């Protein structure tokens, strides 16, 4: 299947860095991707009527479909309708929340190239309208998760654009962000941090 960006450029999945989860055997949830862990967490929040948060679908425009059999359809070509914004959005305690989820195998920093300008602009707009915007960053080698408010991401992005470093150090994330506690259910309890950072 061929997928194209809105500008017509071809999306080549093979050239994208493939994130293979690191398999660890110390407890059962290690090795899950951040997306799987957050989807599991959000399902827990929804089931227990804590919050309503969902993964945003990626909008695609189907262009070419083959029908090898009457009951089967194979998409051969599709385009991204528009650049995606962030990964998740929803409502918690009457407030709109919107966040991006990112993973890195780096030990000491998080590269800002993992963000796109339209994602930064989207987070700015959410904050301007009194929504809550943040990023959850997973350091896969340590199995550590941090919640970092959008204002810090925006500041680090601006620093990069004025000749500063092109990454956020792990020390800066530890200083400005909040370490998330992990467990079985919910896997990544980011709501507890939201209560502390935004609702206290």
From Swiss-Prot:
Region described as Disordered: 1-24
GO cellular component assignments: cytoplasm
Organism (species): Bacillus mycoides (strain KBAB4) (Bacillus weihenstephanensis)
Note on cofactor: Binds 1 Mg(2+) ion per subunit.
Residues bound to Mg(2+): 85, 87, 100, 119
Cofactor(s) needed: Mg(2+)
UniProt-annotated site: Transition state stabilizer, residues: 102
Protein name: Holliday junction resolvase RecU
UniProt-listed Pfam families: RecU
Broad enzyme group: hydrolase
Family: Belongs to the RecU family.
Any one Gene Ontology molecular-function term assigned to this protein's record: nucleic acid binding
Record field: catalytic activity: Endonucleolytic cleavage at a junction such as a reciprocal single-stranded crossover between two homologous DNA duplexes (Holliday junction)
Keywords: Cytoplasm, DNA damage, DNA recombination, DNA repair, Endonuclease, Hydrolase, Magnesium, Metal-binding, Nuclease
